[in-house]
Amino acid sequence: MRKYLTEFIGTFFLVFTVGLTVTAGSPMAPLAIGSSLMIMIYMGGHISGAHYNPAVSLAVFLRGRMASVGELLGYIVSQLAGAITAALATYVTAGKTFAPAPGDSASVLAALLIEILFTFALALVVLNVAVSAKTQGNSFYGLAIGFTIVVGAFAGGPISGGAFNPAVGTGPILVHAAMGGGTLTHLWLYWVGPLVGGALAAGVFGLQEAGTA
């Protein structure tokens, strides 16, 4: 239970930071979001692994680092609950809803590729700095993971909306739609892209680890 509580809390503060910075129109939103992820990773890494992202949980599961499918589903449910609660908290505190969406001039294919590639980068960094036995005990893993999101959000956010996380996509989109602010049109994008990216990262990590002691 403590793992699921930690995943809920970490995902909540990640998505709450997304909501408050995006609705305020802050040009430094990517830095705030990456920093939020970093500090939540240091908060919960020793308890749950600090995934806060169904795509990362999938990658960790595919590498055999989760006990069961049931545990994977527990992580995902906790992450989605945290994201939905954060989107509601954003509405209560900021008076606005928000939702990621592709840029006006971006094609669906371009947005999908951005979500795949930067989620791949995120999950691969997580696997190498927070899962690999060769880097156990390091103190930089939170910084590396958080700044992967900073890079992805600045570089790819204008194209895809910069979720790189099904929870970051789902919670805000559901609340935004429920409040009459939009539709579920792009919801699939923030599941398919990140999950493909996470699965690819698991495969590449396996190749990186192959034959190493």
Where do the language-model regions lie?
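Membrane-interface helix-loop junctions and terminal tails of multi-pass membrane proteins
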Residues: M1-A213
